[in-house]
A protein has these predicted regions:
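Alpha/beta enzyme core
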Residues: 30-36, 40-49, 53, 60-84, ...
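N-terminal binding-site loop/beta-alpha segment at the start of enzyme catalytic domains
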Residues: 11-12, 19-37
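A broad, low-specificity signal for short, low-complexity segments enriched in glycine/proline
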Residues: 16-17, 57-61
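N-terminal amphipathic alpha-helix/helix-capping segment at the start of soluble metabolic enzymes
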Residues: 1-21, 90, 199-206
């Protein structure tokens, strides 16, 4: 039995009605006609069923970070109107919903993909371009902008995707980060980017907004993080402003 599963969870500034979390997954509706309307109906049914917190499929923070060149982002007023359909539908059933921000890095199916180092993914025909120091700060700015847009759209929070080989995880893992500057080398340098993203997002959205950090507990590849390093990162992103750590 799970005696705490259906008990409320107090986050300090808001309370989840239970600890049931619907994890992020792509519905295939993000880029189709009437996609926002259909996603609103889809997520509303989950809220109606009593899920405490819903996380959407990944929304790209910029064009180079999307899963493919036509990935939906949250930029225009039209985008905001579409996403408000989703948040309004979930809130009508007393649900809470966070939008996942997914930067795919070298997993992007696009010749414009970027990463910490120019190391080709085994699942992708394209080789990423290694980011300059200035461009890394631009990526952080895009995470922040998208988080603020999500807040404007009525989301209760965002999930920052930092696991499973995607962009932030590519900086963390030594096998995909061969930089010799302040963003590479030591583990402290390699986790600098996700910490800075969380810190900057928290600074921008204020205290009364959920920030979930998606953390890889186990990389399952050579050159991945050790258990001690994962714990170190978890503590660091919590200190930087994460409300919830999701694995």
């Amino acid at each position: 039995t799970y005696p705490h599963l259906l008990a409320p969870l107090d986050l300090g500034f808001t309370t989840l009605k239970n600890r049931v979390l619907m994890g992020s997954m792509h519905t295939g509706l993000e880029e189709v006609a009437n996609g926002h309307e259909r996603m609103a109906a889809y997520f509303a049914e989950r809220a109606k069923g009593g899920v405490g917190l819903i996380i959407t499929g990944g929304i790209g923070p910029n064009t180079e970070g999307g899963t493919h060149p036509n990935t939906k982002m949250l930029v225009t007023e039209e985008d905001l109107v579409g996403h408000r359909q989703i948040t309004d539908a979930v809130h009508a059933y007393d649900g809470k919903i966070c939008m996942q921000i997914l930067h795919t890095g070298r997993y992007a199916y696009s010749p414009d993909q970027v990463a910490p180092s120019a190391i080709k993914s085994p699942i992708n025909p394209f080789t990423p371009r290694a980011l300059t120091n200035e461009e890394i700060y631009k990526q952080i700015d895009d995470f922040v902008f998208t988080s603020v847009q999500a807040q404007k759209a009525g989301y209760d929070g965002v999930e920052i995707m930092g696991s499973e080989g995607y962009f932030l995880n590519q900086f963390i893992a030594a096998r995909t980060n061969q930089r010799d500057d302040d963003w590479g080398g030591s583990y402290e340098n390699r986790i600098r980017l996700p910490i800075e993203v969380v810190r900057r997002v928290r600074e921008a959205v204020g205290e009364h907004f959920i920030i979930i950090y998606r953390l890889s507990m186990l990389d399952l590849v050579d050159g991945g993080s050790t258990a001690e390093e994962v714990i170190q990162l978890g503590k660091a992103v919590e200190k930087a402003g994460a409300t919830i750590i999701n694995t």
